């Protein structure tokens, strides 16, 4: 068969197949496919639609939100405790604020009989009978969750991200007039609109796109101010504080979160000063000092506008701190702000600290308060206990950081309605410890700090607390540290107690350097005779009841999340690997072995000069007589190749030259 006939024969069966495929394609295009069931979003599977962004759904409290799985909108589930506590605090603030207007709030799951104790006397029964005859419009007004209260609170969340916090306010906090959920990101505002519609709170929550500072500056006038401002930024809130203290109403509530704990805890004192106007110190009480520095910064900003703060609750939890303060206006009260701030003198050796107030307020016979400069310093140039120098920190807030009456109200509300929040048990534990803290005693010591200073065994918590109570001092725990010792005992009394404890668990004095803090502290005989017998009141109530005071790590790789970035990677994507990559990035790299060997060869070998070096070329030091001698720079390092101990030469035995080594 010829080549042309072969090609013609092979092409014959292909033509019908090609025609059949084309006919089937045209017929399929003309036919309408069967209608499959609609999906949840109302789109059928056969319809052409743009690919949707991958989203994740989160249910927290009464709110349900969706947010991109990519790290485009910031969300951290570990801060659920923060949001639960904020809802509880704003609820009690609304109860106080609206109660003055005769409006009673209704909280889901809360019984009126549990919240208000009613003792019906004869007169009250008559009043109750009169109320039955009142017109419906004259009955006491109430505010419920999810309803607009015309005289209620105007709330601003300056950095709302996904809008979760604002939506929870609308669904869980009664007595609200409006909630403005603001964010500078267009993507975040778009997501907020979606979540607001999803939860059915569009009548209360108003998503807004603007710079948080400009928005607050635009609401400086008294009629336009917000009753509650919530600031939960990524990192430091310092850029927003000046605008916040102006935009909150008189007596309004300001809620601020700080997650830049590395700065506030003393790692970068100069950075802390540039942001908050105070120097942070590295100390065991760094978390409480961070709270007091933020309160000082808030009061300092408010004083510029004849305003001042009153702290309601200040919490250090996990990797952040959270403060709730009320802001008032009053020129006379502002004058006392200087006397509420203090500098901190802290010994670098034993850790003893002293406070120096910036101002002094004293009363005159006429009943007026006179303000003057304080006198100081309260310390000598060297520590009287260990002889070391002092570091200067602050200024910081030196007044109470909690309003115990308000904290008690929040604690009672959470205790009587434990099902309201997912973290109710932790809120009860933390607030219980807060109510036990000494309000007029700033900062604290820790058990391990006291014992490690004098190199002795650590006493039990109840033993040290009992010794302080037997000596006539007050002592408490701190919510910021589980082994804290907050006491009004002066440092000399505290070290006397530790000296008495050391006598029961002696330290080998011959192993202590004469210039060490331990040697100098233990060289003094105690004037106070400590009694370590356990007292019943040494064990705090929160500890006896086994409350959840200090939570363990909630999940793996918990802590601060990456900053939200448009089109960024998911927050959990290779997060552990990135942390390993950036770990110790500021440390100097290890010296290369070859470079180290070359560096050591620049120093002469002392044993070679004495004629006792038996290593020859294997010695890590130079055997050249003309090798340069760099006095003061010669390291005292043993040669790594040395395997046997070489006895010193005759000059070394006579005391002219030290033992084996390098000059």
Curated annotation (Swiss-Prot):
ZnF segments: C3H1-type: 599-626
Gene: Trmt1
Residues annotated to bind S-adenosyl-L-methionine: 83, 165, 183
UniProt xrefs under InterPro entries: SAM-dependent_MTases_sf, Trm1, tRNA_met_Trm1_C, Znf_CCCH, Znf_CCCH_sf
GO annotations of cellular component type: cytoplasm; nucleus
Protein name, as recorded: tRNA (guanine(26)-N(2))-dimethyltransferase
EC number: 2.1.1.216
GO biological process: tRNA N2-guanine methylation
Gene3D superfamilies in alphabetical order: N2,N2-dimethylguanosine tRNA methyltransferase, C-terminal domain (3.30.56.70), Vaccinia Virus protein VP39 (3.40.50.150), Zinc finger, CCCH-type (4.10.1000.10)
Range of residues in the leader sequence: none
NCBIfam families in the cross-refs: TRM1
Superkingdom, taxonomy of origin: Eukaryota
One of the record's GO molecular function terms: zinc ion binding
Organism of derivation: Mus musculus (Mouse)
Region described as Disordered: spans on this chain: 534-574, 632-663
Transit peptide: 1-16
Chain positions recorded as Zn(2+) binding sites: 347, 350, 383, 386
Domain Trm1 methyltransferase: start-end pairs: 56-498
Catalytic activity field: guanosine(26) in tRNA + 2 S-adenosyl-L-methionine = N(2)-dimethylguanosine(26) in tRNA + 2 S-adenosyl-L-homocysteine + 2 H(+)
Keywords linked to the UniProt accession: Cytoplasm, Metal-binding, Methyltransferase, Mitochondrion, Nucleus, Phosphoprotein, RNA-binding, S-adenosyl-L-methionine, Transferase, Transit peptide, tRNA processing, tRNA-binding, Zinc, Zinc-finger
Function statement: Dimethylates a single guanine residue at position 26 of most nuclear- and mitochondrial-encoded tRNAs using S-adenosyl-L-methionine as donor of the methyl groups. tRNA guanine(26)-dimethylation is required for redox homeostasis and ensure proper cellular proliferation and oxidative stress survival.
Modified residues (Phosphoserine): 121, 516, 624
